[in-house]
Amino acid sequence: MQGSRLIVALDTASWEQALKWVDRLPQVLWWKVGLELFTAVGPQILQALKERGKRIFLDLKLHDIPHTVGRAAQVAVGYGVDLLTVHAAGGSAMLRAAVAATQGSSCRLLAVTLLTSLGPDQVRQELGVERDPGDYVLQLARLALDQGVSGLVCSPQEVGRLRQALGPEVLLVTPGIRLGDPEAEDDQRRVCTPAAALRAGADYLVVGRPITAAADPVSAWQRFQAVEEAIG
């Protein structure tokens, strides 16, 4: 995969707003379409991005019975998306069904380990996982890779450990990126700066509101791009 390592998230339910961002930032190659936008406007947003020559990260985090996930992944492949997500917690059979659906295509399958909105207390108290979140993430990562996925979506806090444990070939995509204060209040808990994530071994960074909600999205993107270029 070539081009910038920044993926900008189209976090909106509005067709008009999504394309306004895309057209205002023509230098951005990679765009993420998540559940909100895909549910609101359907697959035509993918066609609009393809017509503009963009690469597409379809982040639907598929999590269902194996047959359903396999069929959904097959449909996504037909849209020409470049990256597609499934939940690693869906289990080995579900993961294998998704892998089988994407084989022979240019779509690379990514497994989501643990949502960046979940902090250690929630992982323990609500999910009933008494282990360190990093250990849990590594277990899910190995499960997914054993079934044949191409890479992982993981928080910046886990990316260094995963890179060290899993080697250089695994594609690591990291959301939860904040250019300024990583402790700034929002609904993501496990976040950090782009420089730290890239140095830890992330291949791609997913950035949404710090760019799209900025007073000047172009300047905000340029600041992120400058960090990427400085790291190399």
UniProtKB/Swiss-Prot annotation:
InterPro entries: Aldolase_TIM (IPR013785), OMPdecase (IPR014732), OMPdecase_AS (IPR018089), OMPdecase_bac (IPR047596), OMPdeCOase_dom (IPR001754), RibuloseP-bd_barrel (IPR011060). It is an enzyme of class 4 (lyase). Signal peptide: none annotated. GO terms for biological process: 'de novo' pyrimidine nucleobase biosynthetic process; 'de novo' UMP biosynthetic process. One of its GO terms (molecular function) is orotidine-5'-phosphate decarboxylase activity. Pathway: Pyrimidine metabolism; UMP biosynthesis via de novo pathway; UMP from orotate: step 2/2. One of its GO terms (cellular component) is cytosol. It comes from the Bacteria. It catalyses: orotidine 5'-phosphate + H(+) = UMP + CO2. The active site is at residue 61. Substrate binds at residues 11, 32, 59-68, 116, 178, 188, 208-209. Its EC number is 4.1.1.23. Keywords: Decarboxylase, Lyase, Pyrimidine biosynthesis. The keyword Plastid does not apply. Catalyzes the decarboxylation of orotidine 5'-monophosphate (OMP) to uridine 5'-monophosphate (UMP). NCBIfam families: PRK00230.1 (NF001273), pyrF (TIGR01740). Belongs to the OMP decarboxylase family. Type 1 subfamily. Homodimer. This is Orotidine 5'-phosphate decarboxylase. The lineage of its organism: Bacteria, Bacillati, Cyanobacteriota, Cyanophyceae, Synechococcales. The gene is pyrF.
